[in-house]
Amino acid sequence: MISKKWGSLACLFVVSLLTACSSQEPNDIHQTQSVTTDLSDISVETALTAITNVSDGKGSYKDDHFEMNGTFLNDKLIDGVLILYYTDSTLTFSVKDEKIDFDHVSVSFEDGENYKGQWEDGISGKGTLTFKNGDSYEGDFKNGKMNGSGTYCWKDQACYTGSWKENQMNGNGTYFYDADQTEYLSGTFRDNKPYGKATYFCENHKYTTIWSDGVCTKISYE
């Protein structure tokens, strides 16, 4: 989960007043959480063959580590659902013709987070992560973290869309202050903060801003 503390720039309409940024100085944004899970107990692939004495046809199998529901043949799940149980999470995979669908995986975490998307030896690829507080992220993941391009929306409907690195806003992106997206800041972000030159839009007015370590140091009207 990311929390945002830095507030909106005030809309400034008089050029003579454009000598500084809003008094609502941006603060840091909270750190995100890693969404990795321990797969040391049993691998996804070996779970499909780790059963014995299951009748052919439709049925189910369950032990302490995993559960299968669907059609079985020769002690293998041919079509159905494979569910793996870990100490911190539950993983659900679809199986078709003995093949696991790694593009549509569901992960439910004990802390209330939920992930749906691709799986490559963990949460990697494209997916959607929802947090128990109402925040959500949709985009690229690598090694259980937000990496690549994606959109993070807070429960108050503010959103950031752009580049991510190791669960932080890094690179080019746009931060929308509210749901109607009429007020936003577009530019470069570094470690969850605006950095360098960015363009601020508010009520059809456009401003050029300069940022240093999340603090707006200069603003001018275009």
Task: State the predicted function of each range.
Residues M1-T19:
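Sec-dependent bacterial lipoprotein signal peptides
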Residues I2, A20-E222:
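Glycine/tyrosine- and acidic-biased, solvent-exposed loop/turn segments at the edges of beta-strands
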